[in-house]
């Protein structure tokens, strides 16, 4: 049975048909709008194999989001530096993802824990069409070091299986999207475990899907490689989604091609 390669297929599509566009960083891109990838999470964990993805950074970043944190100090203590380019001298990033997920401010001065609210709905009203978590808080964007690229996500339950769809307004296909796919697939596994559900699909929807001009050669190298089977995720039991640690996330049989370095557009 052939290995599904929706991510690599999108890379090819953008290389072949993407429109040349300028961008905020001044780097230049090839871009397509409104693309979608689908992964059956019961068939394997969607960690890209055509280049090595740094799983440690994926896991610690997600745990950092779930902590409601927005300072890179905790990431640094665990050897993760992926947010350093945007952090202030004190390590602060403003009210980014984790703050919005766990402590969305209300006009009355209270705060909403969107992750806990989503879990409550999954347990009590799994057919709800309102199981959504948003990081796109328009009133707080000016205070964020970087406006959310992966802006909001929705959960959907059918036949005891939990699926998640992410909307990513801005998608750096070579560097960012492999991280995002793995991160939200892992989050879906965690939410499913906490709600007593099996995993269904992870659906990634991208707005501006782009390859930076200085990533084109790296993308061509990646696409020259033969994809390998996806690994298996084993997640330890925890009583709360906020109790997971790095050691609770084990990936078996990950056999990727070597990593490919590329500059980050800041």
UniProtKB/Swiss-Prot annotation:
Please state where this protein is localized: Cytoplasm
Catalytic activity, EC: 2.1.1.45
Enzyme class, top EC level, equals transferase
Associated pathway: Pyrimidine metabolism; dTTP biosynthesis
Query: Which residues does the record give as dUMP binding sites?
Result: 24, 129-130, 169-172, 180, 210-212
Recorded GO terms, molecular function? thymidylate synthase activity
User: Reaction catalysed?
Assistant: dUMP + (6R)-5,10-methylene-5,6,7,8-tetrahydrofolate = 7,8-dihydrofolate + dTMP
Principal location listed in the UniProt entry: cytoplasm
What Pfam families does the record tag this protein with? Thymidylat_synt (PF00303)
The similarity comment for this entry is: Belongs to the thymidylate synthase family. Bacterial-type ThyA subfamily.
State what this protein does: Catalyzes the reductive methylation of 2'-deoxyuridine-5'-monophosphate (dUMP) to 2'-deoxythymidine-5'-monophosphate (dTMP) while utilizing 5,10-methylenetetrahydrofolate (mTHF) as the methyl donor and reductant in the reaction, yielding dihydrofolate (DHF) as a by-product. This enzymatic reaction provides an intracellular de novo source of dTMP, an essential precursor for DNA biosynthesis.
Looking up PANTHER family in the UniProt record yields: THYMIDYLATE SYNTHASE, THYMIDYLATE SYNTHASE 1
Q: What is this protein called?
A: Thymidylate synthase
What organism does the UniProt record list as the source?
Answer: Mycobacterium avium (strain 104)
Per the UniProt record, the lineage of the source organism begins with: Bacteria, Bacillati, Actinomycetota, Actinomycetes, Mycobacteriales
